[in-house]
From Swiss-Prot:
PROSITE patterns per the UniProt record, alphabetical: RIBOSOMAL_L6_1
Gene name of the encoded protein: rplF
Keyword Ribosomal protein found: yes
Organism expressing this protein natively: Chlamydia caviae (strain ATCC VR-813 / DSM 19441 / 03DC25 / GPIC) (Chlamydophila caviae)
Gene3D superfamilies found in the cross-reference section: Ribosomal protein L6, alpha-beta domain (3.90.930.12)
Protein name (Swiss-Prot/TrEMBL): Large ribosomal subunit protein uL6
Keyword Transport belongs to the record: no
GO terms assigned for molecular function: rRNA binding; structural constituent of ribosome
Amino acid sequence: MSRKARDPIVLPQGVEVSIQNNEILVKGPKGSLKQVLAPEVVVDIKDREVFVHAAPHVVDRPSRMQGLFWALISNMVQGVNTGFEKRLEMIGVGFRAAVQGSVLDLSIGVSHPTKMPIPAELQVSVEKNTLISVKGINKQLVGEFAASIRAKRRPEPYKGKGIRYENEYVRRKAGKAAKTGKK
């Protein structure tokens, strides 16, 4: 049994969970999310608490699936209640970002501007031209879009230029040592 899944998921005020046709639906103040349940998992709802158990017929991989679905449901509850946010910072001369409609426009030191379509479920905002904020209720979608932005220009280890998560530590390397010595 998964250690996390031993504890119930406590539902905050304003969040409702229902199960229909092997799908779990979580509704809250920020929206609603759906997830198809695996046959190895049984979900019970009692007194504003959600319990995730392994199905009685499963012998092969109950613990893994139980922990996975506990985490997925927990993230869905947190997403519809408070939401998720990833912040990225751009470091480099001339690096800037702008949101134009449903497109994120990045100037990241290449000969052409990089345009990225923003998924409809996310809100992207730019502060100070170099700080990008990605918000949404789906943790996976927020993380994937933030990672795709970062992948356009990952931070390099010599000067640290690039796009990084806020407060991300970038391990720096020493450059080439200057030539010294007599001829």
